[in-house]
Amino acid sequence: CPPCRAEAPAIHQLSKSLPVLGINQRDKPQDAMAFLDQFGNPYQQIGVDPDGKASIAIGVQALPETLIIAPDGRVILHHRGPIFANELHGSIRDALNSLGIDQ
């Protein structure tokens, strides 16, 4: 999707400092691989959600969405829509501060 393409550089930047996991929602495997071939693969692991049910269960409403999940499983950031490097830095800082971790 165009918003996924737009945020790809920010996700790559994030993957240099934090583990990034991805969920492929409703894409054909060959389309997902073509995306990764074109934009690179920043993901440590990629889950597959072919019918979108798992994404709906965790509250995904639009693509892309970025979640930061604390070690205890709490969602401490849920950003809907593409996220860009300038937004990402502030969002991560705020999320880490909510855990008592100073940046």
Cite the ranges covered by each PLM segment.
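The canonical Cys-X-X-Cys-His
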Residues: 1-5, 66
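Nucleotide phosphate-binding site architecture
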Residues: 2, 12, 76
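Short gly/ser/thr-rich secondary-structure transition/capping motifs
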Residues: 2, 46-49
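Structural microenvironment flanking redox-active thiols in thiol-disulfide oxidoreductases
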Residues: 5-39, 50-56
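Short, conserved active-site loop motifs that form the nucleotide-linked donor/cofactor pocket
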Residues: 18, 44-45
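Thiol/disulfide oxidoreductase modules built on the thioredoxin-like
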Residues: 37-42, 49-96
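Non-globular targeting/processing and membrane-anchoring segments
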Residues: 100-103
